[in-house]
């Protein structure tokens, strides 16, 4: 292929030389016949056009393949650069999509942790309240029992003192005022009244609680 191109190129160069030689021969012939004054301007213009066309043709032939190769090389380079940029764009888009997915997943995970912490806090709060309630009930019950025990002790002591005082008074006055039967009846009546009063006091205290 290169050999054929070289043959064609040399053929066009030879043709150009022949055209110029023919032009010179024509000019010499015109000078010999005495018509150089009329042929000279026409010859110059024709040769100028022919030389220009030959130059353009030679430049086109000489620069065709290099220019074609240059344009093809630039086209390939631009295509590769566009392909690289497209690949980078797709990679960047994929990275952005992955980042969005990770952010969404992290946000969901954070919400789950937050809800878990809130639920655990609620359970802990309820457990603390329940324990405090049980402890307060236990303390109240213990205090009530201590108060009730002390009240029983105080009531028993008061009753004993009251009985002793009453017996002392009765033992001093009854012999002087009433007989033995009346003394026994008065003592029984006193103890009956005391028991009734104690029963009423206990019932009233139970109702008030």
From Swiss-Prot:
Chief location bin: membrane
Coiled-coil annotated spans: none
A molecular function (GO) term: proton-transporting ATP synthase activity, rotational mechanism
Sequence intervals crossing the membrane: 9-29
Subcellular location: Cell inner membrane
Pfam families: ATP-synt_B
CDD domains, per database record: ATP-synt_Fo_b
A Gene Ontology cellular-component term: plasma membrane
Keywords, alphabetical: ATP synthesis, Cell inner membrane, Cell membrane, CF(0), Hydrogen ion transport, Ion transport, Membrane, Transmembrane, Transmembrane helix, Transport
Superkingdom: Bacteria
Membrane topology: Single-pass membrane protein
Assigned protein family: Belongs to the ATPase B chain family.
Subunit record text: F-type ATPases have 2 components, F(1) - the catalytic core - and F(0) - the membrane proton channel. F(1) has five subunits: alpha(3), beta(3), gamma(1), delta(1), epsilon(1). F(0) has three main subunits: a(1), b(2) and c(10-14). The alpha and beta chains form an alternating ring which encloses part of the gamma chain. F(1) is attached to F(0) by a central stalk formed by the gamma and epsilon chains, while a peripheral stalk is formed by the delta and b chains.
Known role: F(1)F(0) ATP synthase produces ATP from ADP in the presence of a proton or sodium gradient. F-type ATPases consist of two structural domains, F(1) containing the extramembraneous catalytic core and F(0) containing the membrane proton channel, linked together by a central stalk and a peripheral stalk. During catalysis, ATP synthesis in the catalytic domain of F(1) is coupled via a rotary mechanism of the central stalk subunits to proton translocation. Component of the F(0) channel, it forms part of the peripheral stalk, linking F(1) to F(0).
Record's protein name: ATP synthase subunit b 2
